Amino acid sequence: MDATVTVVGNLTADPELRYTATGAAVVNMTIASTPRMYDRQSGEWKDGEPLFLRGILWREYAINAAASLAKGMRVVAVGKLKQRNYETREGDRRTSVELEIDEIGPTLRYATAKCSRATQAGHGVSPDPWADSQGSQGIDSHTTRSEEITENAKNGEGAGKNELNKKVLVGDNVSYEDFDSDEVPF
């Protein structure tokens, strides 16, 4: 049985876009979630102990997340907790808990976002069904950036790290693609 959880927190770094030997895109990221509690004696809000949770995304979803998310962004992520056992170079056995992310996006509590549907493999923008009557359509800067990140990572240039559009301004576009649960590669 999988444990499905929802985590709200801030990204500690830009998502790391890489490719497996078979060519599948994969993104790793860490979400820091800090509980806040109200202290009635002092009349102030106090931070609790932060939780740092490592998350992973695959394929087109990984490419879209790398193009849309950046360090410091407040996100909400839903996924399954998975335990991973591994051995260090020194031969020590270790265990880690990771979040296999099913859904992730920026929270709208302190920001706004304009979303546009990405076409196959995160390239280009399909027509916006919610566009105004002028039929505004065009190339989304984040989608174009997604293509650059993908090419750089495939060529080993920056491996996608620090290659992201780091704007976290009100009204920024966020590109994403619907990801059916049958397509989740785990």
Swiss-Prot record:
Keywords: DNA-binding. Residues 119-186 are annotated as: Disordered. InterPro entries: NA-bd_OB-fold (IPR012340), Primosome_PriB/ssb (IPR000424), ssDNA-bd (IPR011344). GO terms for biological process: DNA replication. One of its GO terms (molecular function) is single-stranded DNA binding. The keyword DNA-binding applies. The keyword Transcription regulation does not apply. Residues 175-186 have a biased composition (Acidic residues). It comes from the Bacteria. Residues 1-108 form the SSB domain. Homotetramer. This is Single-stranded DNA-binding protein 1. The gene is ssb1.
